[in-house]
């Protein structure tokens, strides 16, 4: 198949985004396929739930199944049920394995470990592994070293004609497109609109939004984005966040360990408080290795080496423990990774002001912050040094003869500390954009 045929077939089978990776000699079924010295591929690819897979010679291991299909040269697809991502936090790196198992139409002849003679002959040649990304699956296609597609795409990569994505991939859809410039130009237009009424998109139409927290919905509506809870970038490869305060909420994962998961009422009676007979609360900031005087709980990171900034025990996690060592609530590292992968590597924080005068209005800009490279290593380190903290808002109210729960488990960071989460942070004024 030529390049356009590959694109057409991947899209015919549901791909909405196409990326590719030039394969090195070491990218084979024996040594697995290298997906980068970070966990960004986990954010890019729609994988299954992350789980602990024990400890190997390479240290702790996490795995995530990948609903992966091979596209054959005749345009048919077949599932490779053993396909998975393997995460090595010690390095860190991700590898792709199991992609040939129980799949008759897999390109096994192209994915074998090379002999020394083959390795030397192919030293400056690359197969191209294409990934068509759909909502719930990945469709793969690989080319031969000497195919015209391989030669053409490799030449374009060397000429920097494809934007890099998730460290080792290239974005086929955005050939020669500068998404950052597009984003800033769009925001400049929105800034020049001045005050915009609070609104959101519902069923494809813009409707008024009267609640006080409408800045994010309004910004999304101006980009034509409908709130749907799908973990995809808001504008090309950027996540948009309207920002005006001193604190940023990073993620809201429910605990998967401890008393909280078994009996919320008992959790609140043991560690919360009650100012009214019909209400119990648990709402107090907890920071790593700092005893919370109100709840008498200590937040600890079990199985984490702060000096090496790496996970040492895949079955460890972030735990709230009482003075007897009981786990009140906790999050395994698998749970944290699973939630983190839904975040985006590139985030644009958009400042805004609000007016409440015969209706709520917002103006976005002029201050913009572009943050790139949101690595899990930075996130865990920020937790350890208390920059990221747990800020819950949990209660139960006694209504109609029963206790009714309201859960909000937030991990937050102060705006002044946000740079610790990213590799690069740049502040821009839209007034400077021509």
Regions found by a protein language model. Give the residues of each.
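Nucleic-acid endonuclease domains
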Residues: 1-234, 242-434
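Short hydrophobic-acidic sequence motifs that mark active-site Asp/Glu residues
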Residues: 237
């Amino acid at each position: 198949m030529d390049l356009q045929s590959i694109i057409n077939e991947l899209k015919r089978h549901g791909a909405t985004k196409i990326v590719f990776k030039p394969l090195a000699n070491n990218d084979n079924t024996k040594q697995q396929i290298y997906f980068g010295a970070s966990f960004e591929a986990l954010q890019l690819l729609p994988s299954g739930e992350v789980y602990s897979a024990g400890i190997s010679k390479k240290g702790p291991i996490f795995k995530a199944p990948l609903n992966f299909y091979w596209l054959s040269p005749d345009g048919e697809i077949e599932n490779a049920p053993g396909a998975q991502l393997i995460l090595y936090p010690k390095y860190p790196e991700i590898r792709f394995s199991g992609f040939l198992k129980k799949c008759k139409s897999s390109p096994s002849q192209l994915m074998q470990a090379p002999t020394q003679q083959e390795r030397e002959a192919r030293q400056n040649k690359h197969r191209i592994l294409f990934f068509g990304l759909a909502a719930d699956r990945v469709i793969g296609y690989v080319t031969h070293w000497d195919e015209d597609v391989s030669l053409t795409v490799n030449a374009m990569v060397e000429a920097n004609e494809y934007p890099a994505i998730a460290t080792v991939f290239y974005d086929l859809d955005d050939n020669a497109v500068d998404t950052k410039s597009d984003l800033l130009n769009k925001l400049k237009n929105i800034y020049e609109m001045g005050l915009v009424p609070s609104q959101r998109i519902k069923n494809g139409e813009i409707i008024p939004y009267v609640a006080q927290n409408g800045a994010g919905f309004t910004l999304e509506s101006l980009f034509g984005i409908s709130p749907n809870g799908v973990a995809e970038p808001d504008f090309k490869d950027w996540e948009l966040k309207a920002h005006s305060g001193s604190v940023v909420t990073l993620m809201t994962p429910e605990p998967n360990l401890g008393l909280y998961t078994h009996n919320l009422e008992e959790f609140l009676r043991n560690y919360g408080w009650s100012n009214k007979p019909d209400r119990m609360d648990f709402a107090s900031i907890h920071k790593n290795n700092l005893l919370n005087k109100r709840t008498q709980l200590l937040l600890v990171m079990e199985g984490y080496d702060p000096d090496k900034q790496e996970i040492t025990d895949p079955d460890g996690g972030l735990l709230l423990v009482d003075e007897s060592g009981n786990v009140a609530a906790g999050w395994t590292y698998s749970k944290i990774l699973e939630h983190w992968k839904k975040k985006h590597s590139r985030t644009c924080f958009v400042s805004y002001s609000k007016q409440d005068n015969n209706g709520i209005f917002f103006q976005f800009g002029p201050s913009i912050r572009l943050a790139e490279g949101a690595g899990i290593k930075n996130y865990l380190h920020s937790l350890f040094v208390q920059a990221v903290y747990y800020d819950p808002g949990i209660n139960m109210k006694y209504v109609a003869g029963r206790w009714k729960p309201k859960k909000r488990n937030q991990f937050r960071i102060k705006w002044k500390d946000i740079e610790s989460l990213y590799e690069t942070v740049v502040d821009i004024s839209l007034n400077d954009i021509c």
